[in-house]
């Protein structure tokens, strides 16, 4: 089928002026791959292709849309990034449902760009504080004995990793991940994983010796958080969590200042 651009006939000379000095301009033409992507996305959302069903072959899509193979492949790759199709080597694309990870993943590029701007890290740290504050309050009020045992196990691994910075960072992330798992909401999990990934990637490189003291402080603060959750005291759990994250934020800010002075 032919795909026409609705704005092909516009020209700058014939367009009226708007505002004080602005003249309207022709909008950029869409690529064929973008038009194919949009049409396939609408077909999927209209349930013309159900979840788990295979799309037509590349050759069939080329004939249907009257486009070349590169346009079809670019369109399918874009749909894959949106979580609308799965593509395995040698097989036709199969319709899938976007997961929470897919939704958050679409924001990753924008988030990393935001973090690189002045104040970006501080804003994300505040977001993490608000988010995890709700998580620990929920955990203190609703965590089962089994979930508290998982926190205790994560804490034990934390204690065994104090002298190995790479291992401690992993155990630290795992500890906070267990907190995020307690409500059983996959969106919370996806947000939490992404937040930590973005913040950790933005942290400066620090000498191992400087991190050892920080590891011990974080571990003691983790103990306070778990103790409050075990006592089912949401206010104390919140205070312990806020003390911990404010301490982490201040420590990494100081590390960053030191690193910048050395440059």
Curated annotation (Swiss-Prot):
Q: Where is this region: Disordered?
A: 1-22
Please provide, alphabetically and separated by semicolons, the GO molecular function terms listed in this UniProt record. Answer: DNA binding; DNA-binding transcription factor activity
Q: Which SUPFAM superfamilies match?
A: GntR ligand-binding domain-like, Winged helix' DNA-binding domain
Q: Which InterPro entries match?
A: GntR_C, TF_FadR/GntR_C, Tscrpt_reg_HTH_GntR, Tscrpt_reg_NanR, WH-like_DNA-bd_sf, WH_DNA-bd_sf
Q: Which residues form the HTH gntR-type domain?
A: 30-98
Where's the DNA-binding part? 58-77
Q: Which GO terms describe its biological process?
A: negative regulation of DNA-templated transcription
Keywords attached to this entry? DNA-binding, Repressor, Transcription, Transcription regulation
Entry keyword annotation includes Repressor: yes
The family line of this record is: Belongs to the NanR family.
What is this protein's record name? HTH-type transcriptional repressor NanR
The species this protein belongs to is: Escherichia coli (strain 55989 / EAEC)
